[in-house]
């Protein structure tokens, strides 16, 4: 009986280490996207969905909502109507993984989405934890296809760039505001537009 118990114990530990190792190796493939005509193509969309173990339609719906556009899944690719920066695509995928994949208690990706009384929960198979999937605020900013240099706007800083500048996403545009913090409301003047990147200065 002792040998049998020890064997069972070894098997249990091996399963734990296997799951732990798979979690530590969890790396979301970097988005490979490019602009083609008036569309943006995410070339490795299916690979990303498979890695995070989520339904392709669910991931696509989330991305379309965040980009404020329409699109379709075509084979292993996702096609979005409009021209978007690859940095914006990668930021949205990271937000999806944070909200719908990573356990907030143990930080592991061994999770699944389940519904309980119409509430969508993220349940972790690694630690047993669960939490409601937090819904992001509905997009209230305009799609703004007509931003112009010299235009003055009131904006709310949403995040920080690696350089420490405030970041505001507005439709297909990404604005950078110096000396600003997330949650801060500021009045800015557009100094330069390069594609979908908008450089600003404070407007007093």
Curated annotation (Swiss-Prot):
Stored SUPFAM superfamilies: Nucleic acid-binding proteins, Translation initiation factor 2 beta, aIF2beta, N-terminal domain, Zinc-binding domain of translation initiation factor 2 beta
PANTHER family hit by this protein: EUKARYOTIC TRANSLATION INITIATION FACTOR, EUKARYOTIC TRANSLATION INITIATION FACTOR 2 SUBUNIT 2
Protein family membership: Belongs to the eIF-2-beta/eIF-5 family.
Keyword annotations of the record: Initiation factor, Protein biosynthesis
InterPro entries: IF2/IF5, NA-bd_OB-fold, TIF2_bsu_arc, TRAM_dom, Transl_init_fac_IF2/IF5_dom, Transl_init_fac_IF2/IF5_N, Transl_init_fac_IF2/IF5_Zn-bd
Tree of life domain: Archaea
Subunit structure: Heterotrimer composed of an alpha, a beta and a gamma chain.
Coiled-coil portions: none
Record-linked HAMAP family: eIF_2_beta
A Pfam family hit: eIF-5_eIF-2B
Protein name in the entry: Translation initiation factor 2 subunit beta
GO MF term list: translation initiation factor activity
Functional description taken from the UniProt entry: eIF-2 functions in the early steps of protein synthesis by forming a ternary complex with GTP and initiator tRNA.
TRAM domain: residues covered: 146-204
